[in-house]
Amino acid sequence: MPLFFRKRKPSEEARKRLEYQMCLAKEAGADDILDISKCELSEIPFGAFATCKVLQKKVLIVHTNHLTSLLPKSCSLLSLATIKVLDLHDNQLTALPDDLGQLTALQVLNVERNQLMQLPRSIGNLTQLQTLNVKDNKLKELPDTVGELRSLRTLNISGNEIQRLPQMLAHVRTLEMLSLDASAMVYPPREVCGAGTAAILQFLCKESGLEYYPPSQYLLPILEQDGIENSRDSPDGPTDRFSREELEWQNRFSDYEKRKEQKMLEKLEFERRLELGQREHTQLLQQSSSQKDEILQTVKEEQSRLEQGLSEHQRHLNAERQRLQEQLKQTEQNISSRIQKLLQDNQRQKKSSEILKSLENERIRMEQLMSITQEETESLRRRDVASAMQQMLTESCKNRLIQMAYESQRQNLVQQACSSMAEMDERFQQILSWQQMDQNKAISQILQESAMQKAAFEALQVKKDLMHRQIRSQIKLIETELLQLTQLELKRKSLDTESLQEMISEQRWALSSLLQQLLKEKQQREEELREILTELEAKSETRQENYWLIQYQRLLNQKPLSLKLQEEGMERQLVALLEELSAEHYLPIFAHHRLSLDLLSQMSPGDLAKVGVSEAGLQHEILRRVQELLDAARIQPELKPPMGEVVTPTAPQEPPESVRPSAPPAELEVQASECVVCLEREAQMIFLNCGHVCCCQQCCQPLRTCPLCRQDIAQRLRIYHSS
């Protein structure tokens, strides 16, 4: 049994019944009965004890509750001293109070269907007790004090675990009815117990050495004595008083039965009205149910139609999503291959020692070229060289003007659209005339100013430099790749797919690192060219007239390396092949070893490694492309030029169809990468170190962190989109 338990809270109906019964017992003219049965009580309330004590109640009915004890705390059993009938059946009592003998007026005690383990010994003090019902409990024995119940007439102990009766029960001479389980009895024997109450009492009297007398001889004196005690103030005899009392009790019980019958009639009337209301309610429910079924059927049809449309739309979305995922996957593969190729090219340029040798040779050659002869001075085409210098400076200036005009043109596009065509033509004519005047003036000024000639030569030298040109092309390619990677990342976020997000981030960081390295190499190469120019200026004859014009003319007339190699005997297709594979720095090696397409077709990757081509991927690619060119030449012999023929420089061949294009799909290429801040202008700035291309030039100025990845911005790099 748990030490702590929560009291069961009575229902609302039980609480109302308890209040009604308590009020009914307190009314004027109420009978001596207090009925608090079926109120779901876990203990008898204090008010019931007070009512019994103050109003001298004689009957207390507390059956069919949840009582676990008869006497709650702060209550005394003396408050029930006037009680004659105590009905406690159908509860959960485990024991009766030890001072139960204080209820000296008690005549009827009913504790049927409880959980009593034993009876208190003080029960022998209930000298007026006539009926004791302890049926269906857990009693194992009766106390010896039961023999002191001299007025007991009815005793019911069936439904218990009692196997022996106390011998003291023979002293109860008034016992008329004894109910027990004869089959379970040991003492008296079951045969005696099955013979009836008289046989049991005779057996007990014989065992106790007493003479048996029937109860009728002892019952009348007991009743007379009870009558005397109960009518002390009555002048009549005991028989009259007993008759009057019995008549009074009969009248009270008849009144109680009448009230009970009246309540029953009211209950039947209420049930009839309730049944009528339930019928009406059932009809309304049936009507409502039919309408509800119709509405549900309509809703089901509409829902099925909506679900069908929704499933069709979902299938369409899934197909579109799958198509976009395939497209993004293909784009990622293309970008990965291009990034791998860029990394291989960069590694190849780092490891190649021939580049350093060629740069040193080029530096020596530049110094040799800077020596000016008298013949070159006489054959100087002053006007043409000045025009070329002017054109070079003009192109540099135009590039800066175009960049400035590009930004202003985007901001003032609406205002310029409103201006008339006539004004535009007039302005253009004026600008052209001013430009022609400036050009003529600049040409005459270039012929006289050595500093401007030197600047033009420096610009042409940077433009003609092979290594600087390769770095510029790689920077432009990486800018394009970063732009496409940013578009791809934004596309993935809109599609809510994150499966390859980490791979895209790694590729972007690799490209950012490569871009920073190329920018440093570009700056370093420009510094080297300026140092060469400084050395040439220091070694030049200070009094030599038109020194920089002559150097500019030499550099302008100088043939490209690929054209020189072709004139020396290298095949045009082989030169174009190396340029296409970004392996121009191997041209001097191939020319030195006099390699041709036929020789390369007979070589292995190990032979190319011995020659100086250290990259394994490039070795296999060169051999594969050479084999494709020879196979095409066998089908069309006129494609292969004869050896020794001097081939005029032409544009490089188109790449074979087998080469997978590195550009992204057309659908992704035409999409404009808009600024993620203003969502209006095109993205123009690269943020380093993260590599995102997500902002225009106006919006990036106040930013300190990247809007996409929240990384700190270490450097901003402007890119120009080709129109």
UniProtKB/Swiss-Prot annotation:
Pfam families: LRR_14, SAM_2, zf-C3HC4_3. Keywords: Autophagy, Charcot-Marie-Tooth disease, Coiled coil, Cytoplasm, Disease variant, Leucine-rich repeat, Metal-binding, Neurodegeneration, Neuropathy, Phosphoprotein, Protein transport, Repeat, Transferase, Transport, Ubl conjugation, Ubl conjugation pathway, Zinc, Zinc-finger. The gene is LRSAM1. InterPro entries: Leu-rich_rpt, Leu-rich_rpt_typical-subtyp, LRR_dom_sf, LRR_domain-containing, LRR_R13L4/SHOC2-like, SAM, SAM/pointed_sf, Znf_RING. It is found in: Cytoplasm. Residues 569-632 form the SAM domain. Its EC number is 2.3.2.27. SMART domains: LRR_BAC, LRR_TYP, SAM. Interacts with TSG101. Interacts with PHF23. Interacts with FUS. The keyword Nucleus does not apply. Residues 254-380, 510-562 form a coiled coil. The modification Phosphoserine is found at S234, S604. It comes from Homo sapiens (Human). It is linked to Charcot-Marie-Tooth disease, axonal, type 2P: An axonal form of Charcot-Marie-Tooth disease, a disorder of the peripheral nervous system, characterized by progressive weakness and atrophy, initially of the peroneal muscles and later of the distal muscles of the arms. Charcot-Marie-Tooth disease is classified in two main groups on the basis of electrophysiologic properties and histopathology: primary peripheral demyelinating neuropathies (designated CMT1 when they are dominantly inherited) and primary peripheral axonal neuropathies (CMT2). E3 ubiquitin-protein ligase that mediates monoubiquitination of TSG101 at multiple sites, leading to inactivate the ability of TSG101 to sort endocytic (EGF receptors) and exocytic (HIV-1 viral proteins) cargos. Bacterial recognition protein that defends the cytoplasm from invasive pathogens. Localizes to several intracellular bacterial pathogens and generates the bacteria-associated ubiquitin signal leading to autophagy-mediated intracellular bacteria degradation (xenophagy). This is E3 ubiquitin-protein ligase LRSAM1. A zinc finger (RING-type) spans 675-710. LRR repeats lie at residues 30-51, 56-77, 82-103, 105-127, 128-149, 151-172. It catalyses: S-ubiquitinyl-[E2 ubiquitin-conjugating enzyme]-L-cysteine + [acceptor protein]-L-lysine = [E2 ubiquitin-conjugating enzyme]-L-cysteine + N(6)-ubiquitinyl-[acceptor protein]-L-lysine.
